[in-house]
Curated annotation (Swiss-Prot):
Cellular-component GO terms for this entry: plasma membrane
Signal peptide: none
Quaternary structure (record): Heterodimer of ArnE and ArnF.
Biological source species: Serratia proteamaculans (strain 568)
Cytoplasmic side: 1-4, 69-77, 121-130
Protein name per its UniProtKB record: Probable 4-amino-4-deoxy-L-arabinose-phosphoundecaprenol flippase subunit ArnF
UniProt similarity note: Belongs to the ArnF family.
Length: 130
C-alpha cells in the first residue's frame, strides 16, 4: 500500500507542476533569446516564480516516484502516471484561467485512460516488495 501512496503523491505533484508551468508560460509573451533582459525578469517575475515552482514540483514528483518504484512492480506502478493526464484535463476544464473546453471525445479518452489504469491495478493481488 505504501507504494501506491508514493505513486499518488507523485501523480498529484506532477499534475500541479504541469498546471503551474502552463499558467506561468501563458503569462509570458513569445520572444527570442536576444529579447531576454533583466527588465524582462523584473516585469514577469511572478510567472517566472510560478514556472520555477512547477519545475520544483516535478523534482519532488520524481523523488516520490523513486519511492513508488521501490515498493511496486513496474507493471503496476507505470500505469499510475497516466492518471496525471486525466487530472490535468479535469483541472484545465474546471479552473477558469485555463479556459479549456470539455468535449465528448476528450472526456471519453480520459475515461479510457482511467479505465485502463484501474484494469491493470485491479487484477489478482501480487506480492510487492517491502
Amino acid at each position: 500500500m505504501r507504494g501506491y501512496a508514493w505513486g499518488a503523491a507523485s501523480v498529484l505533484l506532477v499534475t500541479l507542476a504541469q498546471l503551474l508551468m502552463k499558467w506561468g508560460m501563458a503569462q509570458i509573451p513569445l520572444m527570442s533569446f536576444a529579447d531576454v533582459t533583466l527588465n524582462l525578469f523584473m516585469q514577469y517575475w511572478l510567472p517566472l516564480v510560478v514556472v520555477s515552482g512547477g519545475i520544483f514540483g516535478y523534482a519532488l514528483s520524481m523523488l516520490c516516484w523513486f519511492f513508488a518504484l521501490h515498493h511496486l512492480p513496474l507493471n503496476r506502478a507505470y500505469p499510475l502516471l497516466s492518471v496525471s493526464y486525466a487530472l490535468v484535463y479535469l483541472a484545465a476544464v474546471i479552473l477558469p484561467w485555463f479556459n479549456e473546453s470539455a468535449t465528448l471525445l476528450k472526456t471519453l479518452g480520459t475515461l479510457f485512460i482511467l479505465f485502463g489504469v484501474w484494469l491493470i491495478n485491479s487484477q489478482a493481488k501480487v506480492k510487492t516488495p517491502q
